[in-house]
């Protein structure tokens, strides 16, 4: 009997202890949350910056927007309401002032630079950092090795390759139009992405992906194209510490498998290009030779070739689609572009990379299209140096996340007159837009980490658009009137851009 009484006593004690422990843990958690909210609102070093209270208390609303793909419109709304700098999370500020752009991303003295958010920029599948994710001296070293592939000399030598795939695009579209009796619309984003993938495949690996010939996504390209969202979700999950490992377990294994397969296929293509020893002006021919006698190691080459394909294809195709959409929605601008292009050339053969550089309205149209629809609309997060920094005349403590919100800056009335109106004239000296702060439009960023292939991208877009407007009359279908109403996960989640094409009669 005494034994049973003892067991019951310990059992009650154990249950009471567990209950007391749960109550204590609950109280401590509640106390911590209340204290954290109080601290973030009233005591945090960023307490003086404008922004809604619900964003200053927790990072969860910010991450919810990231996961749902609604970060871009929400940031635009915040800046419209609160001004050029907004506190978007307890320890993060968003800017739309171009002075902040220069401070955050521009050239700075050693030790004073703004580091990339380590949670957002992870190494490639093989664990090696690319030009996108490397820091400091390592980044400078990688950039020096890649830069010759994007020099003016290289660009001049690559123009025949660019011309070839532009010719192929126009020929395939012409064949499709001639074969279609009912002027069936085509998805121009698909045709643009097939073109840029074929081009970048040829430049990166010495062989195209043959998307244009097949008029479809090949298996490899489909994997790469779908990998963007995978990369976005994996990177976002890493910002949820200490729950990041749990969240990553919830990401379907198929998404990670696609990422791994893309990398392994890239490795095979790099190996095949190196083994061929071909003498042609593609990216690898310059990178393999090295810079100042220092060549890129093979693991580094694998990591960077994957990035070159991802960044070099999607961004240009997005830009082309966005510009096409804006142009077809604005008939007067379309008319001016068509008149400039069709009056500048007597034959289609005259439309080459060098000749399109001399068309001012075409250049303005591209600049305005990229302002309205930047391929990567979200900000690029950075960490302030340990000693802190002055941004737009205000002190920001060290270890603070800061970013220049690209799309919000491009659409801000503080930076542009009629910011939501597509007006190429703003880039041509029209006095109506004299107060525009044009340096606020930076679709390819600035500074030592700006897009290394921006000159190639601009040339591609000008050439392809000139050829399209020379060859076809184009009309947007009614269902695509709101095509630019899109979510984004690093890049835009694009819908089909359905356009009716008809051959120009000459």
Curated annotation (Swiss-Prot):
Matching InterPro entries, A to Z?
Answer: Cyt_P450, Cyt_P450_CS, Cyt_P450_E_grp-I, Cyt_P450_sf, Cytochrome_P450_monoxygenase
Which cofactors go with this protein? Answer: heme
Q: What membrane topology is given?
A: Single-pass membrane protein
Record GO cellular component, one term = membrane
What's its catalytic activity? 4-O-demethylbarbatate + reduced [NADPH--hemoprotein reductase] + O2 = proatranorin II + oxidized [NADPH--hemoprotein reductase] + H2O + H(+); proatranorin II + reduced [NADPH--hemoprotein reductase] + O2 = proatranorin III + oxidized [NADPH--hemoprotein reductase] + 2 H2O + H(+); proatranorin I + reduced [NADPH--hemoprotein reductase] + O2 = proatranorin IV + oxidized [NADPH--hemoprotein reductase] + H2O + H(+); proatranorin IV + reduced [NADPH--hemoprotein reductase] + O2 = atranorin + oxidized [NADPH--hemoprotein reductase] + 2 H2O + H(+)
Entry's Pfam families? p450
Recorded E.C. number(s)?
1.-.-.-
Instruction: Using the UniProt record, name the top-level EC class of this enzyme in a single word.
Output: oxidoreductase
According to its UniProt entry, the protein's GO biological process terms are: terpenoid biosynthetic process
Where does it localize? Membrane
Top-rank lineage group of the source organism: Eukaryota
To which pathway does this protein belong? Secondary metabolite biosynthesis; terpenoid biosynthesis
Where along this sequence does the record place binding of heme? 451
Q: Which UniProt keywords apply?
A: Heme, Iron, Membrane, Metal-binding, Monooxygenase, Oxidoreductase, Transmembrane, Transmembrane helix
Locate the transmembrane regions by residue number.
18-38
Q: Which family does it belong to?
A: Belongs to the cytochrome P450 family.
**Function noted in UniProt:** Cytochrome P450 monooxygenase; part of the gene cluster that mediates the biosynthesis of atranorin, a depside of polyketide origin that accumulates in the cortical or medullary layers of lichen thalli. Atr2 is also able to oxidize the atr3 product proatranorin I to produce the final compound atranorin.
Q: Which PANTHER family match?
A: CYTOCHROME P450, CYTOCHROME P450 MONOOXYGENASE ASQL-RELATED
Name listed for the protein in its UniProt record:
Cytochrome P450 monooxygenase atr2
